[in-house]
Structure formats: C-alpha cells, structure tokens
C-alpha cells in the first residue's frame, strides 16, 4: 500500500502477458528500465504464512523469482484460474470491477517473450 500511496506504479508497464493465465507488471518503464524497491517476505503457505486466497480470475498476487522472499513491486493479475500457484505465491487482493480491462490487456498482441508489442502503461493505481 505504501507504493500505491507514493504513486510508484504511474508510468510502469505490463511487461508479461499470457492469455488464459495472467498479466504481470509493476517493475519496468516503457523503455524497460527497471524501477527498484525493497523486497518483502513472501506471504504464502509454503513460506510459513497461512494465506488461503486462491489464484482465481481477477486475483492480484506478488511476482517473485524462485527465491521465496524476493517479491518487491511486481505483481500479476490472474486472467484465468491457476490453482498450481495456490500456496506458492502471495495472493493479496481481487479485482471487483474492470475485469473487462484485464481481458483486453490479456489479449493484446505480444512477442515471443510474452511482452506486449505496444506498451500497456499503468496510469495510476488507487486503493478501493
């Protein structure tokens, strides 16, 4: 929430888009410069935290490397359910309005690395 309050995400892009799975953003500018912030403890079951939120359509979750406590600003939004992520990634919220926008982003043209061919830029993120 601190990053939202600081408008950290304004101007960043969704850099990984996989239809039928998820859209990922929060770490790069349009010209692929990485925007850094501190990492946090991964709040999910296999890391010792009881988090029962399932990775269903519209759920927000923290992106990370294979290192469990490497999550920072990158997040992903589930386009479709992915139960194999349950207990392994820190789900923390759910889109309640605007799932049509998630569908639109999930279906933009991408290159061979699942990166949109035209940048999908985040204008701002606000608390509900």
Could you describe each region identified by the protein language model?
Residues 1-128:
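Cyclophilin-like peptidyl-prolyl cis-trans isomerases
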């Amino acid at each position: 929430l601190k990053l939202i309050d600081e408008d950290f995400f304004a101007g960043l892009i969704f850099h990984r888009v996989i239809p039928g799975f998820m859209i990922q953003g929060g770490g790069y500018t349009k010209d692929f410069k990485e925007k850094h912030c501190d990492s946090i403890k991964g709040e999910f079951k296999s890391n010792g935290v009881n988090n029962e939120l399932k990775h269903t359509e519209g759920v927000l979750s923290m992106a990370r490397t294979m290192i469990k406590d490497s999550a920072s600003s990158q997040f992903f939004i589930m386009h479709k359910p992915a139960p194999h992520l349950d207990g392994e990634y820190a789900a923390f919220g759910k889109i309640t309005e605007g799932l049509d926008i998630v569908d639109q982003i999930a279906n933009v043209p991408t290159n061979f690395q699942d990166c949109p061919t035209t940048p999908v830029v985040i204008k701002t993120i606000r608390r509900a």
